[in-house]
């Protein structure tokens, strides 16, 4: 377990490891020269728990890699795991991993990690497809998708395997050190046992005064660190002749990292965007055609636009393509030979894959206008044609779900029929009952489009930005008398809704608005 200036959480992390039971021979807590009393707190715990050993570093290492290496050096048990001071191990995690490793004589055992949003407690599984069922992988090249899970903390490693292959973390100030460590593990071709059990809880504190590395993406240094770590990981795999894994890693970069940062580009300043674009182009130029072809279409398109354009462009449209699910908003251009293309002036970025892509994967664009009103709330949807595919499928109906983002539950469900309009457009309108929402919250608008040919597409609506649309409106509430509702656009441009029930909620928003005006 490693920690630095995390006195508020370190005891919970240590206790979660000790609570795993007799399978845990020793917990080695490496304090990276904390200044907030974390070291003394750990010493106090160690005085009462013989299985806890505390290592005090004399100088701060600047990263997570060096203290983890210290732990590897001190480990005397046959197996080792890693834990961060602000996370926890759920009950039974070690037993699940250790049991699989022993039963299958595996050098590495891995299980499911969940990202737990705090304070809401909402959990999102990390790479759940890998851990849907128990399995044994004789060598990683037989399952290239393993490169998608770059985490080091949801795995148990045989200590002699790490030492025999000299597998360590990058030392010093090296962000995304787990990218490199995981590549070194996979390059050593371990026998791996995968379990469906949840073995790690990754705490996500978006409101924290100091953001974690994975959340602190505002500066260009974070993106450069990610590029450097990914480049080094790919080089490690290629040096070990793991070409399939290297290709899968590059394809995953396009689908995950590139899409994630592209969704946030229009939140940054002009200088950041220009710098980001230049650095990203330089890295993507090291990819070959097969790397792009191996990636899912949205990331492939985003990457090709960046390569084709010397300067940042079309950021709002790129953001929508990078969304999950992807949305390709107008205009819909063609190359001179009639091939669908990103734009008339970038005909080399072809979109011909859209002509044969299954409807359930087609990045259809649906504009959404949510209008909260005292006499009833209406959601108007406008479905766009996409190179003839939508008309051929025949839009019929749309299911609209209002989903509680905190708990992932559907609180309202509506269905409406599409009506054809001129210019290859279809519209549908549903009524939503906002008065039934009984607490402050954030609500996602999710759609399922049904077509005459029997196909369907799950989608989100593009939040239309026009005067009077994305603003706060007070509407009646059966529970609280009044409800403050605000439709808004998420980072990816999708339509969502925030609510603040009751007079107190309205007053809070009014005070915040007044404070902003005064400052």
Kindly label every feature range from the protein language model.
Residues 255-263, 303-308:
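Short, hydrophobic/amphipathic alpha-helical patches that form generic packing surfaces
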Residues 197-205, 211-244, 257, 267-287:
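Catalytic core of nucleotide-sugar-dependent glycosyltransferases
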Residues 7, 263-267:
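Short acidic, S/G/P-rich loop/turn micro-motifs used as interaction or catalytic elements
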Residues 245-259:
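Amphipathic alpha-helical protein-interaction segments enriched in hydrophobic
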Residues 267-519:
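Basic, ligand-binding patches in group-transfer machinery
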Residues 17, 21, 46, 230-237, ...:
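Hydrophobic, Leu/Ile/Phe/Ala-enriched alpha-helical segments that form helix-helix packing faces
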Residues 1-224:
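Nucleotide-sugar donor-binding/catalytic module of glycosyltransferases
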Residues 182, 230, 250-254:
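Short runs of predominantly hydrophobic/aromatic residues within well-ordered alpha helices
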């Amino acid at each position: 377990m490693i920690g630095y200036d995390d006195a508020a959480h370190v005891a919970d992390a240590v206790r979660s490891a000790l609570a795993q039971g007799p399978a845990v021979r020793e917990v080695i807590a490496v304090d990276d020269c904390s200044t907030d009393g974390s070291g003394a707190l750990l010493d106090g715990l160690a005085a009462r728990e013989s299985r806890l050993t505390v290592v005090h570093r004399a100088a701060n290492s600047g990263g997570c890699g060096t203290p983890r290496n210290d732990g590897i050096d001190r480990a005397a048990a046959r197996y080792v795991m890693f834990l961060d001071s602000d996370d926890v191990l759920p009950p039974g995690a070690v037993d699940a991993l250790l049991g699989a490793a022993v039963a299958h004589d595996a050098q590495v055992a891995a299980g499911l990690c969940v990202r737990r949003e705090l304070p809401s407690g909402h959990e999102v599984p990390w790479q759940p497809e890998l851990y849907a069922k128990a399995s044994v992988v004789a060598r990683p090249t037989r399952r290239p998708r393993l490169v998608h899970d770059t985490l080091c903390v949801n795995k148990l490693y045989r200590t002699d395997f790490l030492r025999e292959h000299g597998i360590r973390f990058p030392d010093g100030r090296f962000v995304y050190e787990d990218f490199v460590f995981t590549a070194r593990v996979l390059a050593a071709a371990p026998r791996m046992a995968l379990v469906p059990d949840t073995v790690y809880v990754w705490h996500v504190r978006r409101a924290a005064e100091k953001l974690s590395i994975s959340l602190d993406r505002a500066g260009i240094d974070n993106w450069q660190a990610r590029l450097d770590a990914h480049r080094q990981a790919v080089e490690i795999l290629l040096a070990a002749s793991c070409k399939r894994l290297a290709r899968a890693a590059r394809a995953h970069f396009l689908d995950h990292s590139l899409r994630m940062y592209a969704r946030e580009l229009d939140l940054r300043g002009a200088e950041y965007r220009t710098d980001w674009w230049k650095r990203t182009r330089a890295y993507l130029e090291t990819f070959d055609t097969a790397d792009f072809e191996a990636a899912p279409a949205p990331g492939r398109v985003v990457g090709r636009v960046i390569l084709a354009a010397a300067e940042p462009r079309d950021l709002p449209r790129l953001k929508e393509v990078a969304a999950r699910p992807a949305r390709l908003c107008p205009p819909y251009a063609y190359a001179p030979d009639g091939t669908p293309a990103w734009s008339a002036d970038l005909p080399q970025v072809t979109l011909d894959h859209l002509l044969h892509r299954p409807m359930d994967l087609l990045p259809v664009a649906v504009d959404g206008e949510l209008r909260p009103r005292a006499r009833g709330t209406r959601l108007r949807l406008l479905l766009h044609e996409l190179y003839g595919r939508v008309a051929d499928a025949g839009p019929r109906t749309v299911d609209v779900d209002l989903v509680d983002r905190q708990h992932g539950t559907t609180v309202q469900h509506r269905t409406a029929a599409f009506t054809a309009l001129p210019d290859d457009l279809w519209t549908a309108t549903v009524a939503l009952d906002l008065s039934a929402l009984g607490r402050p919250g954030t609500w996602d608008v999710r759609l399922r489009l049904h077509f005459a040919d029997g196909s369907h597409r799950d989608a989100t609506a593009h939040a239309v930005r026009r005067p009077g649309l994305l603003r706060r409106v007070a509407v009646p509430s059966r529970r609280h008398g009044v409800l403050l509702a605000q439709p808004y656009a998420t980072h990816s441009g999708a339509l969502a809704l925030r609510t603040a029930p009751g007079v107190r909620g309205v007053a809070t928003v009014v005070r915040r608005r007044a404070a902003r005006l005064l400052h």
